[in-house]
Amino acid sequence: MNRIDERLAALKAAGRKALIPFITAGDPEPDMTVSLMHALVRGGADVIELGIPFSDPMADGPVIQRASERALARGMTLARVLEMVAGFRRTDPDTPVVLMGYLNPVEAMGYAAFASAARAAGVDGVLTVDCPPEESDEYAQVLQSHGLATVFLVAPTTPAARLAAVARLARGYVYYVSIKGVTGAATLDVADVARQVGALREHLSLPVGVGFGIRDAETARAIGEVADAVVIGSRLVQEIEAAGAQAPDRLQALLAGIRQALDA
């Protein structure tokens, strides 16, 4: 078991739901990322999803696109993201970290080199948005051989063949995309999410995290009733964009309110 498995199993045993926040590495400033990660933990994060900035983030809405642009403009690279995780690990050996991003930077580094460097930095899992599960056997094998969980997205439109590949290759948890479209879009239908997550559980034994469209404590609590984990990203990145130097304190306060609602 890696840190993700241990944390999610402990939460399940305690009857609690996991809170998984997302931020983009290097936004608003590279020097602030590790402080933001610690602020998320103080606010109640169980797992941190750390976004790898990318020039063409096709699955992301305007808020996270702008975050990627800001981070890239400040010189962020995949290697620097790994340095940030290593910096976080110097004072937090326990909170699981999942890298979320696109395949191109990983391919540029090489699967094995990336997996080795990620593991050495203290990464626990990798979610590669544009890597189809049914084409991911080699990639998943390399990551898993280095002790990294392979997290995959599933959606209401995921076909049976792809779902079968996810069931075979996924580790850690599965990220259910609760609405069609890009991150930060639309309003989700909690009743529909409940039906879809119930159907997913017939095929998957891993914990199910739900993301896309969760913007406040009330929605997070409702999703927590039907899922194992609540993933929140665009709302936090929006807060970072508005808060500037106050981002760590603002993020901690925002997440603490969501944590309180989940535990109510």
Swiss-Prot record:
Keyword Lyase applies: yes
GO cellular component, as recorded: cytosol
Reaction(s) catalysed by this chain's protein: (1S,2R)-1-C-(indol-3-yl)glycerol 3-phosphate + L-serine = D-glyceraldehyde 3-phosphate + L-tryptophan + H2O
Organism: Laribacter hongkongensis (strain HLHK9)
Its biological purpose: The alpha subunit is responsible for the aldol cleavage of indoleglycerol phosphate to indole and glyceraldehyde 3-phosphate.
Transmembrane segments: none
Matching Pfam families: Trp_syntA (PF00290)
Gene of this entry: trpA
Assembly behavior: Tetramer of two alpha and two beta chains.
Keywords attached to this entry: Amino-acid biosynthesis, Aromatic amino acid biosynthesis, Lyase, Tryptophan biosynthesis
Protein origin, superkingdom: Bacteria
Active-site residues annotated for this sequence: 49, 60
The protein's name: Tryptophan synthase alpha chain
GO MF annotations, alphabetized: tryptophan synthase activity
InterPro entries named in the record: Aldolase_TIM, RibuloseP-bd_barrel, Trp_synthase_alpha_AS, Trp_synthase_suA
Pathway, per record: Amino-acid biosynthesis; L-tryptophan biosynthesis; L-tryptophan from chorismate: step 5/5
Protein family according to the UniProt entry: Belongs to the TrpA family.
EC number annotated for this UniProt entry: 4.2.1.20
